[in-house]
């Protein structure tokens, strides 16, 4: 049984700002994604889900190299399913058109991937270096994560 009952809209901005201020800029994306996965896993656990599903595809962007996905997975205790993993961009666009998400995906707006993007993001992250960089957040991250989780907006989705 799939556990897709609702959507969680997380205000991640304060976490992003802390990462931006305290961590090496070439590691911004991978560190942000690791904290996003931790938050996603929190809600999946809360909803008694058995895994996370993402829309990543190998090589589409810097954060979707094999090494980057491994670094992202490293923070998760539950399985991460990636049904699009080997599809090319055109296949993914076709699917997004079929499930009526394409038009939303191309809207021009600033999000975490455009505002906090590194000029030269790491594509082969070293997990030990990433963990060392994350230690720079130790004084603030627990409170920031708690606030992000506590202020999350939950949007109920009709099962049909």
Predicted segments, located by residue:
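A short alpha-helix-loop-beta-strand transition element characteristic
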Residues: 100-108
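Short active-site-adjacent structural elements
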Residues: 61-63, 89-93, 105, 114, ...
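Generic beta-strand/beta-sheet core signal
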Residues: 10-13, 54-55, 83, 106-107, ...
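A generic structural signal for well-ordered coil/turn residues at beta-strand boundaries
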Residues: 6, 48, 109-112
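Active-site adenylate/phosphate-handling loop in enzymes that bind or generate adenylated species
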Residues: 16, 21-94, 98-99, 144, ...
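Conserved beta-strand segments of alpha/beta enzyme cores
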Residues: 6-8, 79
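The feature marks non-catalytic terminal segments
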Residues: 107-160
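Short, small-residue-biased leader/transition segments that mark boundaries at the very start
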Residues: 2-4
